[in-house]
A protein has these predicted regions:
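Weak global preference for isoleucine
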Residues: 9-12, 31, 56
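Alpha-helical structural elements
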Residues: 3, 15, 29-35, 61
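A short, structured beta-strand/loop element
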Residues: 20-54
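Mixed-charge, Lys/Arg-enriched low-complexity segments
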Residues: 45-92
Length: 92
């Protein structure tokens, strides 16, 4: 079951002006590594966007460390990628 590592309190705005609250989620894969992705929850109650896998780390501690280093610019790019994944999969 996925776990939330970090919830960011400052929203990231999409190109259409919607404010999204990012969070870093992750889970253990079949061979014991941890994969993590970003989810973006819109403040308007719309669909939560999810990026593709953003990192693979050997353990939970390293996922937390990675998440703690994410910058606003990285989160903005990840939101763009999450929008692209959503549209490519026929949502939104």
């Amino acid at each position: 079951m996925p776990e939330v590592f970090v919830r960011f309190i400052e929203p990231i705005r999409s190109h259409d002006g919607v404010a999204y609250y990012p969070r870093v989620c992750g889970r253990k894969d079949d061979i014991g590594r941890w994969e993590a992705w970003l989810e973006f929850e819109p403040d308007d109650g719309g669909e939560v966007l999810r990026s593709a896998r953003e990192t693979i780390q050997p353990n939970q501690t390293d996922v937390s460390y990675w998440a703690g280093g994410l910058t606003r610019v990285y989160l903005e790019g990840a939101l763009d990628r999450a929008h692209a994944v959503t549209h490519r999969n026929g949502h939104g």
